[in-house]
Structure formats: structure tokens, C-alpha cells
Amino acid sequence: MIKETLPGLYSWSEYSEEKKLDFNGLLIIGKDESIIIDPPDLGENDELELKDIIDSHSSCPLKAVLLTNVHHERASGLLKDKFSVPVWVNKLDKEALEASTDKTFIGGDTLFCGIQAIQLEHQKSPGETAFYLKDQQIMILGDALIGKVPGEVSMLPPDKYKDPAKAKVCLNKLLEYDFETLLVGDGTSILKGAKEAVKTFLTN
């Protein structure tokens, strides 16, 4: 089921039995364009519903599928073909993708819908990127932080990093930005008070 989590922001999930978490995807309808982020697999009904939502916002055409990291490739190839849009990923993750990517970005770039790309160093993959929507005070993360417990954030298991301590320190970069909402690729997102939750985790 696809739901409107926030005005102009739709989400859907696929439950991972292995991880015991929801894998989350996003559709963002901007002022004059739309994007999909980290799409997990969709059932047939969800696929039709996603198409209906996109078609109903024809004045904001879908421009791209954006990936926060190489491991969130997921259903991007399917949606690339279905909607004839390019897949974008951080330049540092391009070579590791299973399928060929169309476009790359780097930290500091401004992408579709006004999204700011924030490079996060020393994470699970070299191209881990946060997507920031300044006007809406929304931060979007892939594997940098996950939501295992509602209202809280945590990192992936230590064996996913070359240096877990350094990876955690580098996440302090997120606190340089003002955000109320944190949308995570894995687990439960935080719609209010998200920056405080991130700060609490990083300072413990």
C-alpha cells in the first residue's frame, strides 16, 4: 500500500524477513517535477497505484530515480524501464551497481525537487549520501541510520564498516542542518523531533 506520509510525499514498504525491518521507498511530488528514492519491490497493485499517483500529477513529471547508496538499488531498474527515467547514484558507488546507472552526482550537488546531496564519509559504501529538503526540513537517509525502534535511530551492525567509530563521528555532519523529519530507508521514520533523536544517538 502506498500512503501519503506528508503533503506531496508518498511512501511504500517491503518487509525484510532477514533484517526484520521495512525497506522503504519514496515518491516526492515537487512544485514542477517528481522523483523516486530508494524504491523497494512493489506488488502488482502498488505498482499500479504508483503509476496512478504519478499520472495524476502530470504537471510535475517524474524525472529520476535517486539512490542514497549502491545497496538500495532494489527495484530501480524496473521503475527506470517502466517510467523511462534515469537512475542517479553517487559517483563513488557507480562501479558497484549491479545494473548500469545513467547519471551520477557528488556531495554538494543540488538535485531534482531542490534536494541537496550530502556526502557521508566512512559509511557502509563510499557513496553513502543523505538527501536534504531544506524548505520542508526533511532529511532522507539510506543506510547511514536506521529505525529499529520507533522514535529512535541506530547504525548498522559494526561489521558493516571498516571503522564503526569513525563512521559514527562522521554522522555529526547531519547536525549542521535543520530538520524536523527523518525518513529512513530501513525501519521506522521519525516525522517530528528527528534532529533531537539523531543528536541523542550521536552523543551517547
Task: Describe the function of each predicted region.
Residues D41-L111:
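Active-site HxH/HxHxD metal-binding segment of metal-dependent hydrolases
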Residues S11-E17, P39-E44, A64-L67, I115-E121, ...:
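Short, flexible loop segments at the rims of nucleotide/cofactor-binding pockets, characterized by
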Residues L9-W12, S34-D38, V87-V89, I115-I118, ...:
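Short hydrophobic-aromatic micro-motifs
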Residues E47, E73, G114, S125-P126, ...:
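Structural motif corresponding to alpha-helix initiation and N-cap regions
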Residues D102-L133:
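Internal catalytic-core helix/loop-beta-alpha segment
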Residues M1-E33, D52, L175, E196-K199:
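Zn-dependent metallo-beta-lactamase
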Residues E33-G43, C60, H122-T203:
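Metallo-beta-lactamase
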